[in-house]
Amino acid sequence: LSEATSVAVNSVDEIIVYNRGTKPIIIFDKEGNYLRSWEENTFSNAHGISVDNSDNIYCVDSGDNTVRKFDPSGNLIFQLGKEGERSEKMSGLPFAVPTQVAVDESTNDFYVADGYSNAKVHKYDENGKYLFSWGESGTGEGQFNIVHNISTDSEGLVYVADRENHRVQIFDQEGKYINQWINLSRAACIYVDKRGKEDIFYVGEYFSGIASNDTGTDLGPRISIFNKSGKLLSRLGKESYGPSVGRFYSPHGIC
């Protein structure tokens, strides 16, 4: 692995790693044993990977401004965006350095977080037909400052990691603002565990990025765990960044 930017798990518990390296998509079993890899020389800058109920794989390339959907065998189903063509910064048009896809399991519609040079979430149907978008630059409700990651819960609600606003915003399926979780440190990724009676939410937080806080504690990088009402249940990673067990550098993807 070079930079493992995102990770997903399919229905047979295979771990799919999106890697910035010679082998961009690497698949392991649940014990970490290498199984296979594919799509060499396809991606410019791997950023976010997601899997739907049929084990189709969505790969977001922030370098060439594309979203690609593959079947479980790695065959391309469709591509959104054209390599080398980026929408004008903050134009609101897809795509301007997109980051992640989230699939609504109840409808198979999906959402694209867009991203570094836009302040939008775009919604598409399962065939890649554009439906609508929402969001704008800012710090208010429904506004974004780097739409860095996105996920959905068992009811189809949409959770957006609004990284530089240090929060997670929650929307319904029509893009209507519902709520937000604050007191986060650069919320970079979010995973919703839907296997139990109640959804559990894992939020990866970056280090604050301020040199004077290099030795600070409980500022990130860390993983915060919430219930559906936004109650903090636990946190992993109390110390500053580092290689030892229980510490992180930059939690960029969770599954």
Predicted feature residues:
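Eukaryotic scaffold repeat domains enriched in small/polar residues
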Residues: 1-255
